[in-house]
């Protein structure tokens, strides 16, 4: 068993990137299984800040091969833009990043349609990043989308792109202002540049498994944004949990060694959708300010609230975590007391599990447990026992409620602001 999977356990922005960065330094291969450049995270390494969107963060490790898997969707110009930004920071990525030839391609027309669909929804808008992710997965599911392998036959490429555009034109008419010929010309320039990066991931990963190489899978988004198990329809368009890993990469369940759920010490969400523990008050504002809760991809302020253990337990039920990484504990250092959600009720009746109906979810009453704050800095802590007693009790309350041990605790933004409890649990 050689595969470690890192997944978001809430609504994204949990800080998966830092743990992925730490684990990538022990890995030979780092993979993305699903999603596109709608996800985003920041890594601080050797005093340099790197922003990642579609690229795996294993690129920070010079000895790590990186794979964008078949379940991903790729906007090729954005791929190169992100790659060039990393290289400007001194990273040598040559021969270390590959895209599956089965991954679907995001075109500019998908991004335009993303915006038009949001306008169509009016007040019921999803709050997408408008990166074209949803429309690309839609054309994938209707079997009309283009994959990376389609880009290298010019005639096939133009025919297939024409069919996609025609379908959107029938729907949106003159509202769709898209120059297909300009896109075709763009890919005449990109085709040769892209060719060295596109591979068949199946033999690549099969060979790695045969050699028992250490493989890291870096999840994008999070379980509560999963198309099947999240707060549908206020979700992304792919399977963001363990299921998406197994279908988006050809690794197989028998290869799994560890499935790690990353949990922020409080809860945040970007975009629309139900958020039972959201705090539209001074507590929410303080979390937003102290936690610097602004999206890497969108620049939007994140909605903030208390830690919701109903969400985390639902996430564990779907992904079967072997360990948790609790992040941004230091953001809570200056609170007198902390609340954690332990159950929901509706019309006086306690609910079992997490509701699938978003209208019901918007009406639930949240039951909280109040825990004492610690009013001491945690950022300097190097070991678990360095943490204040109340902080340790907060960690242990989470463990006992969810039924999974917290193996890593984040107490600051830098790579070394991570406490490992491997020897304590």
Swiss-Prot record:
It comes from the Eukaryota. The keyword RNA-binding does not apply. GTP binds at residues 12-18, 40-42, 302, 328-330, 410-412. Its cofactor is Mg(2+). It holds the Pfam family Adenylsucc_synt. This is Adenylosuccinate synthetase. Keywords: Cytoplasm, GTP-binding, Ligase, Magnesium, Metal-binding, Nucleotide-binding, Purine biosynthesis. Binds 1 Mg(2+) ion per subunit. GO terms for cellular component: cytoplasm.
């Amino acid at each position: 068993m050689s595969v470690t999977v890192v997944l978001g356990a809430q609504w994204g922005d949990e800080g998966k990137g830092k743990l992925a960065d730490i684990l990538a330094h022990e890995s030979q291969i780092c993979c993305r299984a699903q999603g596109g450049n709608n996800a985003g995270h920041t890594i601080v390494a050797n005093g340099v800040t790197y922003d990642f969107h579609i690229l795996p963060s294993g690129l920070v490790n010079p000895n790590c091969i990186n794979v964008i898997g078949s379940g991903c969707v790729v906007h090729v110009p954005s791929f190169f833009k992100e790659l060039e930004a990393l290289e400007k920071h001194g990273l040598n990525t040559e021969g270390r990043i590959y895209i599956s030839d089965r991954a679907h391609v995001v075109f500019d027309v998908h991004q335009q349609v993303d915006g038009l669909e949001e306008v169509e929804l009016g007040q019921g808008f999803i709050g997408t990043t408008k990166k074209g992710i949803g429309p690309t997965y839609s054309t994938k599911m209707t079997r009309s989308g283009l994959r990376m392998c389609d880009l290298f036959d010019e005639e096939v490429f133009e025919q297939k792109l024409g069919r996609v555009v025609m379908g959107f034109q029938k729907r949106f008419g003159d509202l769709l202002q898209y120059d297909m010929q300009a896109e075709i010309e763009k890919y005449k320039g990109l085709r040769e540049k892209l060719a060295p990066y596109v591979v068949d991931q199946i033999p690549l990963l099969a060979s790695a498994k045969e050699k028992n190489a250490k493989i890291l899978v870096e999840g994008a988004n999070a379980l509560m944004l999963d198309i099947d198990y999240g707060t549908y329809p206020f979700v992304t368009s792919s399977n963001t949990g363990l299921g998406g890993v197994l279908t988006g990469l050809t690794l197989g369940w028998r290869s799994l060694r560890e499935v790690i759920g990353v949990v922020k010490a409080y809860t945040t969400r970007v975009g629309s959708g139900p958020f039972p523990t959201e705090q539209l008050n001074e507590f929410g504002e303080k979390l937003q300010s102290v936690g610097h809760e602004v999206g890497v991809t969108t620049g939007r302020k994140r909605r903030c609230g208390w830690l919701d253990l109903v969400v985390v337990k639902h996430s564990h039920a779907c992904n079967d975590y072997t360990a948790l990484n609790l992040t941004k504990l230091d953001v809570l250092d200056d609170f007198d007391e902390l609340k954690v959600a332990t159950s929901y009720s509706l019309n006086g009746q306690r609910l079992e599990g997490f509701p699938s109906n978003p209208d019901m979810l918007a009406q639930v009453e949240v039951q909280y447990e109040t825990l004492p704050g610690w009013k001491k800095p945690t950022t300097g802590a190097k070991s678990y026992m360095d943490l204040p007693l109340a902080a340790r009790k907060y960690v242990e309350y989470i463990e006992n409620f969810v039924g999974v041990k917290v193996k890593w605790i984040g107490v600051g933004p830098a790579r070394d602001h991570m406490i490992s409890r491997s020897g304590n649990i």
